[in-house]
Amino acid sequence: MNKIEELTDDTFKSEVLESNIPAVVDFWAPWCGPCRMVAPVLEATAQKMNGRLKFYKLNTDENLNTAQEYGIMAIPSLLVFKNGQEVDRIIGFMPQEQLEEKLQNLVETPQEN
């Protein structure tokens, strides 16, 4: 089982940018209705991906620096990182099947050196 971990401005670099495992970061806020709709989709997707991707949540209200650094203007925003680089950005809600297909393609793409 792959759970979704909370990130902060302090842990973002070590957990996401320095990881060898691709990561999905959900930029969200507690007051955001669509963010609450994304949460169960991410949880189910994380379980299906079975450790091939790391899944994180970053509360934009509490971690403004990282949100500003990545130009987060709307939430929910899902940023996908591979080899320390942002490789995809999904803004708003995406159905689970669509999200899984998109992430599966990322996992199957060979690592670039």
For each feature predicted by the language model, list its residue ranges.
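Conserved helix-turn-beta segment immediately C-terminal to the redox Cys motif
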Residues: 20-22, 39-58
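Conserved redox-active cysteine motifs that mediate thiol-disulfide chemistry
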Residues: 27-41
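Conserved Rossmann-like nucleotide-binding pocket used by diverse enzymes
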Residues: 3, 8, 28, 54-56
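Structural microenvironment flanking redox-active thiols in thiol-disulfide oxidoreductases
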Residues: 60-67
